[in-house]
């Protein structure tokens, strides 16, 4: 096993992903499970691997991810940001392409809290004028 490793941390909603890239054949593990088995959806898998595809590093790195919190969609977003940040440690040349694709921006959208007197964050009972 190689000593060279690149780390990246990604967060999305309430998910947090610690990503480690090592030179290898393209193995992708999430929480010690094969990524396809963990995410269970090709759409989420494609979303998580987007930075690798954009930087054209498909079969060059083994990816190990430890992700916690949230649902699968939030976890896939956190993994995507973590991989993008780890790729920046590999080479700064990837920055331009990743930045224009929006891979380096932390998605700050989170669920709005429920307010007292309302049914949900903004949903209120029907208003009657008369």
Swiss-Prot record:
GO cellular component, one term: cytosolic small ribosomal subunit
Lineage, top ranks: Bacteria, Bacillati, Mycoplasmatota, Mycoplasmoidales, Metamycoplasmataceae
Biological process annotations from GO: translation
PROSITE patterns membership: RIBOSOMAL_S9
Biased composition (Basic residues): 111-130
Residue ranges of the region described as Disordered: 109-130
Family: Belongs to the universal ribosomal protein uS9 family.
InterPro entries for the chain: Ribosomal_Su5_D2-typ_SF, Ribosomal_uS9, Ribosomal_uS9_bac/plastid, Ribosomal_uS9_CS, Ribsml_uS5_D2-typ_fold_subgr
SUPFAM superfamilies in UniProt: Ribosomal protein S5 domain 2-like
Record key words, sorted: Ribonucleoprotein, Ribosomal protein
Single GO molecular function: structural constituent of ribosome
Top-rank taxon: Bacteria
Database matches in NCBIfam families: PRK00132.1 (NF001099)
Official protein name in the record: Small ribosomal subunit protein uS9
Keyword Signal: no
